[in-house]
């Protein structure tokens, strides 16, 4: 009898150890543009926090924070990093980007362009990872670029005509620098790129894009740096898993424009999902109905430390 109990206890300890190790090596990242700090609906910041609570990410890469960060962080019990100069008040309503974490923060990663790129190092069970929150301008934009009567070459030139391409060129040196250091310190880059993906405009999808295969510059640049689009890696078929994060009621304007990219020998994605609902309408997560405060969908990717 004693021997049987000893075997059972040993087995239970093995299971517990396995569970703890799984927790130590796995983490979940969320990227979300919350739209004007969530303030465009009644109790919006609270609804933002409730949605995050149901998804339960370990790290959040947030866009359009605009003063709501401290409330959301306090509500959820996360560490909070505002992507702005150190002396900036955490509730500054002009600051766009932020990062939340259940894990301790390390070194700041400041850029000359904090409105559209910045980051911080986070230590996850002994592994330092560089996290970046990002926003790029929405122009140029067309709801249905496949109907613009442009060739692939003309579309690529059109894509470079306004603010988004200029922003990308400004932050590209930072991205190159950190991408080149990922053998020792991996990086995760996420947010609202306001850009279509070259991985969604392929030969497999040309029938829904007026027979066009378009290597969109914004995402192709990241691909060239070796960054992996986590959602498309885990959901390789754009037809069955479009991953829409931008959709407008009453018109054809459904696109995937929010992303989580990563690079590094010591991390890999294991699962990626998207969540979406129309602004000011209900979203149901884990059986709970919450009024959706944003016009952007959510990307959530699970990672594992190698």
Please identify what each model-predicted range represents.
Residues 2-6, 20-75, 89, 93-94, ...:
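N-terminal, active-site-proximal structural segment of metallo-dependent hydrolase catalytic domains
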Residues 110-111, 177-187, 195-306:
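Metal-dependent phosphoester-hydrolase catalytic domains
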Residues 160-193:
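His/acidic metal-ligating clusters that form di-metal
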